[in-house]
Structures are given as structure tokens and as C-alpha cells.
From Swiss-Prot:
Keywords: Cell cycle, Cell division, Chaperone, Cytoplasm, Isomerase, Rotamase
GO molecular function: peptidyl-prolyl cis-trans isomerase activity; protein folding chaperone; ribosome binding
Protein name according to UniProt: Trigger factor
Compositionally biased tracts (Low complexity): 438-449
Organism: Acidothermus cellulolyticus (strain ATCC 43068 / DSM 8971 / 11B)
Matching NCBIfam families: tig
Catalytic activity: [protein]-peptidylproline (omega=180) = [protein]-peptidylproline (omega=0)
UniProt remark on domains: Consists of 3 domains; the N-terminus binds the ribosome, the middle domain has PPIase activity, while the C-terminus has intrinsic chaperone activity on its own.
This enzyme's EC code(s): 5.2.1.8
Gene Ontology CC entries for this record: cytoplasm
Cell compartment(s), UniProt: Cytoplasm
Length: 449
């Protein structure tokens, strides 16, 4: 076999492969055996029909076609191995010559991972925000915790922000009650802005038994129109928050004193912020590398992924009785802008994958069994399924190699992060130990092939 590689672009190559007919003989012989298993000829057992009989019965051309279908993947794979390129898509094959006794010539165009010259990670400095926990941070957490233990006490006064009221409400458009436009006996926090626009202002100042009407601008299918709403207050209840003392600490936690609870909250906030700092370091390291490197992406893969995500959006919108443009309009985004954002996201995701795959290849990183197990557990947890179910899903969908590649990228990012210099905004060195994040959360993956 002879093969040549032509570089069409930094992300696409063209193979030209020539195979002599003598090299095809094992493939032709195997094709005869396959065909012999499929044909039934009186006097011969299945699989035992001689080649001359097959030639007369169904024609040698059928055998040669089978041999061709088997030979192309085999010799294409050899050509890829010899060229030592990382293919990332299915090849576009064109047979330019194949005749009985003359051998085979074909071309294969395929997308490849671009060559990336990585900088020495030890020359890179990443700056992150420092981890600090103030008394105000602890106070805010304590206040939120106390709020969860608050009780509601009926009061005989006008409603004000923060009160909980029991309400009946009807919303009409052009005199007709809207679908789902009736609320009966609902508990609502005044000032929460949870139901319809204008409700909070209408409720303030009302006492139990009083009603009010107000204009309610609509969203969704009725965006741009204004309905008329009527609300009646049945009851007003005031939220009573417990005092922050040792008794509250014993009620709300495992601690005996408020100071012990405060110390625990401070430590928990610090732990969370160290994880956030680690995530920030990963993101800023990636962005630093992306900014310093020119990493081209294959347009065919980008276009295919953009189309796939557009179809996902279409199905999501359709399930809600809308089209994609209408759904995006609710979010204040045009279809054109959304497509531009999706394309930019896909291109960035591919560049990150190429970058990390290059690290994996250069450093010959491999996954240990425990690392793969951790990855599967983390991914399964995020998806809300058991690790066994997630692993079985990967096997059923033949996506185990994609999962392994994704886990390796996470390991590559950790490898880089351990070798760069990380400092906070004051210039102090940062030790990221203890703030690690799952490799599964590094970057979303784009299916390349």
C-alpha cells in the first residue's frame, strides 16, 4: 500500500491511497467466504460454496463490491496510522480506481486536530480573587437561616412588604378570564414579584376583606398586551423571625451556642469560596491559553453542532407550543443573535478540546481505573442517575470513548493547573489544594466524529 497526505487546511487533510491487487487478495478471499455464508446453492452446505460457483451464480462483481467495502476502512486506517494525525470526523471517501486485477485507488478527506504549540505552563501566571469571609457574610447566612425558621402570625392591619397574604385573584383580557388566570386561597409574599406585574403595589395597604383592581402587563403568548386583574385579600400574616441566640443555634443546628454556629458558617462559606476560586483559576487558565494561541476549528464540525443545537431548541420550543423565535423573544434575544452566540460557544468548546487533547497526547496522560470511576460518579450525580445506570447508558450508546476522552481532558486541565503559578489580586501565592472541582465540570463536550 502507498499513501500520501495533502494538507488542505490546518484542520483538514486529504489522503490518496493506492493498494495493489495482490494486497487485496486476503480481503477478496474473506469476501468470498462472507458471500458463501449468504447464498444457498443445491448440493453445497452454507459457507462451502466454491468461488467459481459463486462467480457463475451471482457474479464476481458482488464479491468485489464486498471486498471493496471491507478494504477501504482497513487501508484508510493504515494510512491514518502512518501519517500520525488525529482525525476528528468521518472521512469523505471517493474511489478513483477499482477494477478486477488492477488494484484500488481512493481518496479520503477528513477533519483533523490542528497542531498546537503549547507554552511551558511554568511560564504562566493566573490571577484569581482572594478568599475572604467577612462578618457581614456570616450575618447574611445567619439571617437567611433564621428566615427559614420564621413563623407567620395573623395581624389586623394593612399589608406591607414582607407580609404573607392569602389571596383570591382573577386576570381578564378583553373581559375574558385567561387560562390559568384564576387563583383561589393562595399564600403570597408581598414584594416577591412572583405572580403578575403590578400585584405587589396593589396589595400594599389592603387589609383582610379588601379588594383592588390593577393593570397587569402580560408576557409569553400575550407579550405586549395588558390585562385587568382583581385581587381580594383574605388574611394578612406577619413573618416573625426568631432571635439570634444560643436557643436558636440549638433549634436550627447541631451546635449549642450561637458562636459555634457562626464559626461553622464561616468555615462553610470559606470552603465554598475556595471551590469557586479553583473554578475561577481553571477558567482563567483556559482563557489565558486561548488568548495566546491561534487554534483553528473545522467549519464542518462547527456547522453540524450549530444545526444540532438549533434543532434541540426547536423541539424544546415546540413542546411548549411556541417556535424558537418566540421563545427567544421572551428572553430578550433575537434568533440571529442566539445563533451567533451558539456558534461562538461551539467554536470555543472545540478550541478547548483541541488544547486539552494536545496536552493529553504530549504528556501521554492515561486514566487510572479509580479516576474513571470518580468521573462516572460525578457525571451520574449531575444527571440525577445512578453510576451503574449511567455506565450502562454509555455502553448502550457506544459513547464510552467519548466519556474517557472527556475525563482525560479534565485530567489534562488539572495537570496544567498544578504547573502554573497562581496568585490572588494582592500578589500572594494561592494554594489550590482542597478546592478541587470534578473533572466532569471543566468544559462541555462537542461530539467531533
Amino acid at each position: 500500500m502507498k499513501s500520501a497526505v495533502e494538507t488542505l487546511s490546518p484542520t483538514r487533510v486529504k489522503f490518496t491511497v493506492e493498494v495493489g491487487f495482490d494486497e487485496l487478495q486476503p480481503t477478496v478471499a474473506a469476501a468470498y467466504r462472507k458471500v458463501a455464508e449468504q447464498v444457498r446453492v443445491p448440493g453445497f452446505r452454507p459457507g462451502k460454496v466454491p468461488p467459481p460457483i459463486i462467480d457463475r451464480r451471482i457474479g464476481r462483481g458482488v464479491v468485489l463490491e464486498q471486498a471493496l467495502n471491507d478494504a477501504i476502512p482497513q487501508f484508510y486506517g493504515q494510512a491514518v496510522d502512518e501519517a500520525a494525525v488525529a482525525v476528528i470526523s468521518q472521512p469523505e471517501i471517493e474511489v478513483t480506481n477499482f477494477a478486477d486485477g488492477e488494484g484500488l485507488t481512493f481518496t479520503a478527506e477528513v477533519d483533523v486536530r490542528p497542531t498546537i504549540e503549547l507554552p511551558d505552563p511554568e511560564s504562566i501566571t493566573v490571577t484569581v480573587d482572594p478568599v475572604t469571609v467577612s462578618d457581614a457574610d456570616v450575618d447574611a447566612e445567619l439571617a437567611a437561616l433564621a428566615d427559614r425558621f420564621a413563623t407567620l402570625k395573623p395581624v389586623d392591619r394593612p399589608a406591607r412588604r414582607g407580609d404573607f397574604v392569602t389571596i383570591d385573584m382573577t386576570v381578564r383580557l378583553d373581559g375574558e378570564v385567561l387560562e390559568d388566570g384564576t387563583v383561589t386561597g393562595a399564600s403570597y409574599e408581598v414584594g416577591s414579584a412572583q405572580l403578575v406585574e403590578g400585584l405587589d403595589e396593589a396589595l400594599e395597604g389592603l387589609t383582610a376583606g379588601q379588594s383592588a383592581e390593577f393593570d397587569a402587563p402580560l408576557a409569553g403568548p400575550y407579550a405586549g398586551r395588558t390585562a385587568r386583574a382583581e385581587v381580594t385579600v383574605r388574611a394578612v400574616r406577619e413573618k416573625q423571625v426568631p432571635a439570634l441566640d444560643d436557643a436558636f443555634a440549638q433549634q436550627a443546628s447541631e451546635f449549642d451556642t450561637l458562636e459555634e454556629l457562626r464559626a461553622h458558617i464561616r468555615e462553610r462559606i470559606g470552603r465554598t469560596r475556595r471551590i469557586q476560586q479553583h473554578v475561577q483559576a481553571r477558567e482563567r487558565l483556559l482563557q489565558t491559553l486561548l488568548d495566546s494561541l491561534d487554534i483553528p476549528v473545522p467549519e464542518r464540525i462547527v456547522d453540524a453542532e450549530v444545526r444540532s443545537r438549533a434543532e434541540q431548541l426547536r423541539r424544546y420550543a415546540e413542546a411548549r407550543g411556541m417556535d424558537a423565535e418566540g421563545l427567544l423573544a421572551q428572553q430578550g434575544e433575537s434568533l440571529h443573535d442566539h445563533e451567533a452566540h451558539v456558534r461562538a460557544d461551539v467554536e470555543r468548546e472545540l478550541r478547548v478540546q483541541f488544547l486539552l487533547d494536545t496536552v493529553v497526547a504530549r504528556e501521554q496522560l492515561q486514566l487510572q481505573e479509580a479516576e474513571l470511576t470518580d468521573y462516572l460518579i460525578q457525571r451520574a450525580t449531575r444527571l440525577g442517575v445512578s453510576p451503574d445506570d449511567y455506565a450502562n447508558q454509555l455502553v448502550r450508546t457506544n459513547t464510552v470513548p467519548l466519556a474517557v476522552a472527556d475525563a482525560l481532558r479534565g485530567k489534562a486541565l488539572t495537570y496544567l493547573l498544578q504547573r502554573v503559578r497562581v496568585v490572588d489580586t494582592t500578589g500572594a501565592p494561592v494554594n489550590l489544594e482542597g478546592g478541587s472541582t470534578p473533572a466532569a465540570e471543566a468544559e462541555p463536550a462537542v461530539s467531533e466524529a
